[in-house]
């Protein structure tokens, strides 16, 4: 593949996530009905984001914890020039201690354990077992896009970085699927088909399979993204991202459909956005969405620095 195409998709992955996250905040935690009420004509721009008690905590055009935590991983890759799990965990904890706005309850509980930074995976396992192994939130899949941009060992790195906070095999499988999809798009110009994704999912947890089926064979509505009791489930987010990957004809179309579905929309759109950015490249992300990001120039500098590691 030409280097220019790789670079476009590489940058598209990171910007695709940040844009999806920032736009998805507009409908986060809303039911689809509420989305219709607040945005009767849809949403096209950050300036339209309603300023209720939840959303006014962020300035329009800012991303949330999804991209913050992804950038903790990216910063670690660049600073260490390698994958260092303890360094990533330290950066997560530092981010949490310095505000950590939007942090999920599960992620907070894991990182609040006293010895988190010395043995993060053990902390994640303890909290998972304390919850009777039921918790499978989307707080790891939301940040895994950047792992797909590593040149090698994507599977093991996605597994281990996931387990810094999320130990459940559904979370681990979600992360490996997303990172593998991005890696294949960026570096191999290859689409993972249904059989490929099922093959990966089976290695982790059979419960992933039904969501792969919904994403491949059914409409986006079949995923019930705004389900009040389980909107933060890792498999709903994975399903939304896979639906966009296989069915969206453009970055914009895929993101808007997911955003207008409500639920945990910033996370769903962040993960789908990373995949669509990897598929279509940074130039296919609407210019006003990229330039409208509050920290667009900082993000651009970070991605360029990460990309330069491969030169």
Describe the function of each predicted region.
Residues 1-311:
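Structured, active/binding-site neighborhoods that engage oxygen-rich ligands
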């Amino acid at each position: 593949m030409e280097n220019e195409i790789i670079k476009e998709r590489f940058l598209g992955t990171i910007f695709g996530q940040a844009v999806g996250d920032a736009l998805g905040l507009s409908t986060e935690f809303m039911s689809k009905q509420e989305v219709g009420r607040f945005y009767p004509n849809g949403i096209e721009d950050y300036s339209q984001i309603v300023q209720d008690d939840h959303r006014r905590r962020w300035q329009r055009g800012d991303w949330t914890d999804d991209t913050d935590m992804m950038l903790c991983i990216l910063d670690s890759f660049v600073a260490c020039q390698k994958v260092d799990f303890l360094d990533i965990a330290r950066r997560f904890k530092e981010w949490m201690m310095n505000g950590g706005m939007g942090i999920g309850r599960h992620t907070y509980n894991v990182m609040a354990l006293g010895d988190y930074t010395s043995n993060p995976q053990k902390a994640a396992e303890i909290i998972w077992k304390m919850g009777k192994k039921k918790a499978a939130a989307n707080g790891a899949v939301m940040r895994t896009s950047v792992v797909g941009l590593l040149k090698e060992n994507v599977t093991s790195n996605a597994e281990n970085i996931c387990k810094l906070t999320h130990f459940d095999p559904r979370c681990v499988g979600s992360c490996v699927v997303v990172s593998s999809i991005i890696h294949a798009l960026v570096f191999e110009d290859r689409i993972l088909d249904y059989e490929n994704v099922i093959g990966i999912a089976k290695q982790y947890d059979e419960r992933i399979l039904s969501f792969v089926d919904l994403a491949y064979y059914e409409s986006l509505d079949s995923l019930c993204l705004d389900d009040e009791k389980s909107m933060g489930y890792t498999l709903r987010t994975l399903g939304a991202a896979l639906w966009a990957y296989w069915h969206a004809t453009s970055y914009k179309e895929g993101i808007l459909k997911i955003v207008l579905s409500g639920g945990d929309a910033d996370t769903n759109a962040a993960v789908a956005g990373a995949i669509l950015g990897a598929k279509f490249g940074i130039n296919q992300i609407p210019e006003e969405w990229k330039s409208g990001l509050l920290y667009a120039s900082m993000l651009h500098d970070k991605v360029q620095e990460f990309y330069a590691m491969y030169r």
